[in-house]
Amino acid sequence: MSHKLVLVLNCGSSSLKFAVIDALTGDDQISGLAECFGLEDSRIKWKVNGQKSEASLGAFTAHREAVEYIVNDILGAHPEIAAEIQAIGHRVVHGGEKFTRSVIIDESVIHGIEDCATLAPLHNPAHLIGIRAAQASFPALPQVAVFDTAFHQTMPEKAYIYALPYKLYRENAIRRYGMHGTSHLFISREAAAALGKDEADTNIICAHLGNGASVTAIKGGKSVDTSMGLTPLEGLVMGTRCGDLDPSVIFHLVNRLGYTLDEVESVLNKQSGLLGISELTNDCRGIEEGFGSGHKGATLALEIFCYRLAKYIASYTVPLERLDAVVFTGGIGENSDLIREKVLNSLAIFNFNVDKERNAAARFGNGGQITTDEGTVAMVIPTNEEWVIAQDAIELIK
């Protein structure tokens, strides 16, 4: 069988996820993570055909050294895989309004990603470092950028414009952009197939739930509304992010309580959400354990998380007009039968009837319908953003 292999790179501020994916099947040939960049113990872990390995990258190394290690040591040890790589696919968090679809990277694309860096200051600069490193290591291979924001560029103006002076949008592009677009796109395609429908005739609400979380209304395969905004801070309760908030809270923290703006930003992004409410952990597994043992903070955090999510799902029936299914994905969405059941029970008005056996079975990579055959469909579909990136890369280089 012929392969169409793509090296997928996902560069964070202090880490780099990588995988060699077969765009035809979605199978990983190689997958791994380099982390702790800039520290004394930078390391890289990887897996080839199920066999795990680990190595030190050396002190204070970063993206370039990680890419070089991937090329020289990992791929160098597997020339049969390296020889079949046809493109490099890069995940890019923010493409602003400039990038409405995946693109082959050239200098103009790099400048465009740089221009969007103020909208994703932790992510876009890291992506650019990864792109430059990959260009140096793979000068003969085409490089493709796949944007988290691109899928949401089909939202109508009434969904993405904030009720601020319009010139802030016109002159500064302040608007809702949304994130997790690659995941929501994958789920849109997979949900239509699972329902036996054409994607253009499928309306779903997708809940991507992880440490970062977002909900998207998808009508006929296109995003029509999403919960994250200008940045990933808006919307749902998340691991450490507050989600929706009265903006005057910021003024109160600064003017009355003496916080600096940097401190406020840290509170809203890194100290809030499940962690802030529970005063215990940002990890949903720990929250569920606390809920089970009667921990007051964990119980409150879980209740608020589920309540906010249920409200968003209910509100996103408005732009859809008809709902074919609610789909849960992401680390929490794929594994927490407790949260799924609590959320769907709150949406009984929409005729969701949770099948406890199906719901309990949909964990650890197992998906499928979690409601009874009577009533509205809810299902679990494990996401695969890397596969979408690989598919887009191969499609663009045809």
UniProtKB/Swiss-Prot annotation:
Cofactor binding summary note: Mg(2+). Can also accept Mn(2+).
Gene Ontology CC annotations of this record: cytosol
Amino acids binding substrate: R91
E.C. number(s) listed in UniProt: 2.7.2.1
Active site residues per record: D148
Keyword Transport: no
Highest taxon in the source lineage: Bacteria
Binding site for ATP: K17, H208, L209, G210, N211, G212, D283, C284, R285, G331, I332, G333, E334, N335
GO BP, sorted A to Z: acetate metabolic process; acetyl-CoA biosynthetic process
Cofactor(s) the record lists: Mg(2+); Mn(2+)
Localisation per UniProt entry: Cytoplasm
InterPro entries for this protein: Ac/propionate_kinase (IPR004372), Aliphatic_acid_kin_short-chain (IPR000890), Aliphatic_acid_kinase_CS (IPR023865), ATPase_NBD (IPR043129)
Keyword field: ATP-binding, Cytoplasm, Kinase, Magnesium, Metal-binding, Nucleotide-binding, Transferase
Positions bound to Mg(2+): N10, E385
GO molecular function: acetate kinase activity; ATP binding; magnesium ion binding
Site (Transition state stabilizer): H180, R241
Annotated catalysed reactions: acetate + ATP = acetyl phosphate + ADP
Binding partners and assembly: Homodimer.
Entry function: Catalyzes the formation of acetyl phosphate from acetate and ATP. Can also catalyze the reverse reaction.
UniProt family annotation: Belongs to the acetokinase family.
Protein name: Acetate kinase
Organism: Shewanella pealeana (strain ATCC 700345 / ANG-SQ1)
Taxonomic path: Bacteria, Pseudomonadati, Pseudomonadota, Gammaproteobacteria, Alteromonadales
